[in-house]
Amino acid sequence: MGLSDCLIYRLVVRCFLDYSICAPFYFYHKFMLSASEPVF
């Protein structure tokens, strides 16, 4: 397992964990904003 593979694996795991934690808050925030103004 090369160094690049290890970094990619850690990046994927970190992104997955961050997404699973932050996604509900992100979508809730986006939903609340969409009620008053468009979100890009």
Curated annotation (Swiss-Prot):
Location(s) in or outside the cell:
Cytoplasm; Nucleus; Membrane
In what way does this protein cross or attach to the membrane?
Single-pass membrane protein
Q: In which tissues is it expressed?
A: Expressed in cotyledons, hypocotyls, roots, newly developing leaves and shoot apical meristem. Not detected in flowers, siliques or mature leaves.
GO biological process, alphabetically ordered: auxin-activated signaling pathway; negative regulation of auxin mediated signaling pathway; root development
Question: Any one cellular component term from GO for this entry?
Answer: nucleus
**Keywords from the UniProt entry:** Auxin signaling pathway, Cytoplasm, Membrane, Nucleus, Transmembrane, Transmembrane helix
What induces this protein's gene, according to its Swiss-Prot or TrEMBL record?
Up-regulated by auxin.
Bilayer-spanning residue ranges: 7-29
Tell me more from the record: Knock-down mutants have no visible phenotype in the absence of exogenous auxin, but are more sensitive to auxin-induced inhibition of root elongation and initiation of lateral roots.
Main role?
Negative regulator of the auxin response.
The protein depicted here goes by the name: Auxin-responsive endogenous peptide 1
Species classification: Eukaryota, Viridiplantae, Streptophyta, Embryophyta, Tracheophyta
Q: Which gene encodes it?
A: AREP1
